[in-house]
Amino acid sequence: MTRVHFIGIGGSGLSAIARLLKESGYQVTGSDKTLTPFAADLQAAGVTVYVGHHPRNVSGADWVVKSSAISDDNPEVRAALQAGIPVYKRSDFLGQLMTNKTGIAVAGTHGKTTTTAMIAWMLSALGRDPSFIVGGVMANYGVNARMGKGNAFVIEADEYDRMFLGLQPRIAVVTNLEHDHPDCYPTFEDMFSAFEQFIGLLPPDGTLIASSEDEGAASLLPRARKGGRHVVAYSLQGEMTINSPQWMQARSLKTNERGGFTFNASTNIAEAGVQSVSVSLQVPGEHNVRNALASLSVAAVMGLSLKNAAIALGEFKGTGRRFQVLGEK
């Protein structure tokens, strides 16, 4: 049995990959400075987790995967290289996992965790049984990753350290784009350039779905079109044909008794022409309406039932640490 060792297994990114490999039948071990909640969950699932980094931890491993936070001076990295064990960065390993899958990658400064989770839940409810990696624990599942039997692979595309440039998306979602991670991107232009490279990973028949309300995300639409790719713009209000012949728009927003918004989602993505479905979310905030529009756009691009997709989104319960209810008084 192939053994894969993860250095920095306690983070949301590596813990998710570790879970996928464990579910796929690999022997999985890992180490981190402390036993984080993610690491503890993996322990409960049968993964051996070492607290602290020591050369002996990699002994017998076939592959080693390291977090972007782990330097090449880490004792386990040095031991693996000296032993001739291949050491992969997270981004390189993720790209391999997505091979031969329909990759759906969600990027953006804000909202990517919830949007990734929404899409994963929606596709699951529609019977597609996707694999997914989310940067937080999904309330509907209680985990941040799962290896499904379907062809879709939904992944949160982390721009930190340009991780998302190792992915293989067929559908890319960009929620918004603001200057972040100045240690990686000294200027906004540096960050925007990385996002241009990200959408450049789409195949010629791939699709970019982006918010037309956000200047940074909307700026990517004409660039994707210039490359011949399909583009979809989404927003709460406004002219949807700007930069995109295909659109998804929310209209008639009203708060509902569950704490979220009820609204009509209209789109011209389907071959049948403009159609509209009613959506009633239980997760609060207009930002989640936007996240739902991105998710519905994915469903429309994949040719799935928008009515059933809307029902599934109404059952979405959110993700951990994102407006999470911790108790009631």
Q: Could you tell me what each predicted segment is?
A:
Residues T2-R3, I7, S67, Y185-F192, ...:
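Adenine nucleotide phosphate-binding catalytic loops in nucleotide-utilizing enzymes
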Residues S59-D62, K149-N151, Q246, E257-G259:
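A short, glycine/Asx- and small/polar-enriched loop/turn
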Residues M1-F93, E215, H230, Q249-K254, ...:
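N-terminal leader/targeting and accessory segments in enzymes
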